[in-house]
Amino acid sequence: GDVYKRQAIGKSENMVCVASDALAMAHLTRNVIYLKDGDFASLNRDSITIWDRSGQRVNREAITVSSAPSLIDKSGYRHFMEKEIHEQPDAIAHTLSAMRESSSIEEKLADVSNLVILAAGTSHYAGQIGRYWFEHLAGLPVSVEVASEYRYRHPAHEKGGAALAISQSGESLDTLMAMRHASKLGLKSVGIVNVPESTIAREADFVLPTRAGPEIGVASTKAFTAQLTVLFSLATRLGLKRGHLTAAQVDIYETILRGLPGAVGQAISQFESVRTVSQYLKRAESCLFLGRGLLYPLSLEAALKLKELSYIHAEGFAAGEMKHGPIALIEDGLPVICLLDDHELSTKTISNLKEAEARGADIILISTQSAAEKVDFAKHEIVIEDCNPVISPVVLAIPAQILAYLTAVEKGTDVDQPRNLAKSVTVE
């Protein structure tokens, strides 16, 4: 059978240690041996002996991992999550550099008939946003699957498809097993991971790295925006290769990408302005998040961030779905948080907000400047500078993260290690 919890053996001059993640041993050693499926090992202070599943003694190569101790320090911030929010401009810039180094990936995927995105949690919401980009920019049919469900299904895929497995750790069991399932069904596999030594990175046919650096906080921030950066860049390059975009259009999108670290940095500069909203929100027992188009999946991610950090019940909905059921939840004082940009459909979203406000909801806007100017009935606003709507999920993710973080701080919860959660989920 498969190893359901990958083991890493760390070795230094006078000690041996074992963990499921090399990051846990970064303060002790950077020399790591990864066991393969079926391996078992005998350890003592001076030696490591490994046998494979057949009982044969084997040598497994030690590698030097990239997570230096200096990278897992809070660097003066109160929490790792706060630090990681502030690291996002650099994480995006480094990821863009990595994508430029992956210059042939569109050649390898140019002839795929469809994409299947496999992921869990925050990575799944990144995949949902990516679906819009692949459809719009590359003309590719895309399905986004919950990894824990996909691995037990018998999906009917067109021949010539590819599976994108998205995982910060590269060790998420459900995503790994879903990727293996997709490979057995004949799909090419592409891993989008933040840990280059991970199992998904080793087993995927192709790898697109996010270079966000070690992410310690359980609630993902910089890995999420780095994943979005990879997905957007890949979509534009596939769009050009498949003839769906012109070179001139791709140049425009490349310019947008080059400006992304700066746009994200500007959004982070609004950090303290979010505090007033968090002081209001900490008293809520429940709230709704709304978004439309690219911002619908971001509303799901924003709701996840708030619930996992502050333990406030939060649900995300497509704004147009409010009238099909969720509007029954509206009562006086219920916070309804809307992610809004100046898109061609923004007037429809504003109409949905008016319906909620008329029934007693407290409207909170997380929006770009020009979109905010169209709304005069919000109780609170978190406003960032305008950006191209095609990339707004990356930029608007920042104030959503800050709101969840500061609300949790106001409530006094364990921000970096929320209850009942783990950073890398390696069990079923």
Describe every region a protein language model picked out.
Residues V3-Y4:
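Short, small-residue-biased leader/transition segments that mark boundaries at the very start
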Residues K11-N14, L43-S47, D52-G55, Q369:
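Short acidic-glycine loop/turn motifs at beta-strand connectors
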Residues I48-E107:
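Catalytic P-loop NTP-binding/switch module of NTPases
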Residues G55, C387-E428:
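Generic C-terminus detector
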Residues M81, E87-V116, F206-P335, A408-E428:
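Active-site phosphate/pyrophosphate-binding segments
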Residues A110-G259, L339-I384, L403, K411:
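Glycine-rich phosphate-binding loops that contact phosphosugars or nucleotide phosphates
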